[in-house]
Amino acid sequence: MPELPEVETVRQGLAQWVTDRRIAEVQVLHPRAVRRHAAGAAHFADVLRETTVRDVRRRGKYLWLPLDSGDAVVGHLGMSGQLLLQPAAAPDETHLRVRFRFADDGPELRFVDQRTFGGLSVSAGGAELPTEIAHIARDPLDPEFSDATFVAALRRRRTEIKRALLDQTLLSGVGNIYADEALWRARLHGTRPTDGLTGPAVLRLLGHVRDVLGEAVKEGGTSFDALYVNVNGESGYFDRALNVYGRADQPCRRCGEPVRREAFMNRSSFSCPRCQPRPRRAVPARG
């Protein structure tokens, strides 16, 4: 699933190409793509006609396009969603779900989604911040993110540090890949109890999270297959810089110990057994 760097890369591309453009027509080619829009596909298309995109913003892994009407288009890429800018004459993609045509002669915006886990909706009055995503915490790259608030909230939790990093109500945008990479840099195992971490240790980890996310944004994100691309259909390159994620049994880039792969929340965690030893005290299992 796209994480913050991938979604931010898409946001930057959209901001360059759709800001201040007026929507002339919207075609919904698959109703599942707008299933989160309760009023239905026809209403989705109708309410967007003749509106102008004012900006492109992001909260965690969600995008929204504020409109001059005061509403907003909210989007989530899911597992395979793509927002592509294409010339109007370009052939339709096999999994094209929604098409936005603009009043000028510039490229059209297409929502393509093979697995249809992603989707678009209109948030009434949501231009500043859609209510649908208001519960999601700010991300570590957000200028208004509070380090002190995060440290205090994290240390009150009785959970494992990796679970906390993936909790979108604590901080947003961090997924499995970048959590593993930040924990490796911080020399912390993902099962380390949060209530045992000192404030300075949490701040050091937060610094590594920011570094990993920032570096990944510069590389256009991480692409493991053809499903993640930017608005021009290009893949990201951060996978070449990964230190542990996806490198099971390969030598740790820091100490040479083979990287360990472990099951975690129906996915996999990657860590170095030497640099990131398991904690002696585990978080008690919930009853």
Swiss-Prot record:
Entry keyword annotation includes Oxidoreductase: no
Origin superkingdom: Bacteria
Active site: P2, E3, K61, R267
InterPro entries: DNA_glyclase/AP_lyase_DNA-bd, Formamido-pyr_DNA_Glyclase, FPG_cat, MutM-like_N-ter, Ribosomal_uS13-like_H2TH, Znf_DNA_glyclase/AP_lyase, Znf_FPG/IleRS
Complexes and interactors: Monomer.
Keyword Transcription regulation: no
Family, as annotated: Belongs to the FPG family.
Protein name per Swiss-Prot or TrEMBL: Formamidopyrimidine-DNA glycosylase
EC number: 3.2.2.23, 4.2.99.18
General function of this protein: Involved in base excision repair of DNA damaged by oxidation or by mutagenic agents. Acts as a DNA glycosylase that recognizes and removes damaged bases. Has a preference for oxidized purines, such as 7,8-dihydro-8-oxoguanine (8-oxoG). Has AP (apurinic/apyrimidinic) lyase activity and introduces nicks in the DNA strand. Cleaves the DNA backbone by beta-delta elimination to generate a single-strand break at the site of the removed base with both 3'- and 5'-phosphates.
Gene Ontology biological process: base-excision repair
Molecular function GO terms recorded: 8-oxo-7,8-dihydroguanine DNA N-glycosylase activity; class I DNA-(apurinic or apyrimidinic site) endonuclease activity; damaged DNA binding; zinc ion binding
HAMAP family: Fapy_DNA_glycosyl (MF_00103)
Record field: catalytic activity: Hydrolysis of DNA containing ring-opened 7-methylguanine residues, releasing 2,6-diamino-4-hydroxy-5-(N-methyl)formamidopyrimidine; 2'-deoxyribonucleotide-(2'-deoxyribose 5'-phosphate)-2'-deoxyribonucleotide-DNA = a 3'-end 2'-deoxyribonucleotide-(2,3-dehydro-2,3-deoxyribose 5'-phosphate)-DNA + a 5'-end 5'-phospho-2'-deoxyribonucleoside-DNA + H(+)
Zinc finger feature spans (FPG-type): 243-277
Taxonomic source organism: Salinispora tropica (strain ATCC BAA-916 / DSM 44818 / JCM 13857 / NBRC 105044 / CNB-440)
Keywords: DNA damage, DNA repair, DNA-binding, Glycosidase, Hydrolase, Lyase, Metal-binding, Multifunctional enzyme, Zinc, Zinc-finger
A Pfam family annotated for this UniProt entry: Fapy_DNA_glyco
Positions that bind DNA: H95, R115, R157
Cofactor mode of binding and number, as noted: Binds 1 zinc ion per subunit.
Necessary cofactors: Zn(2+)
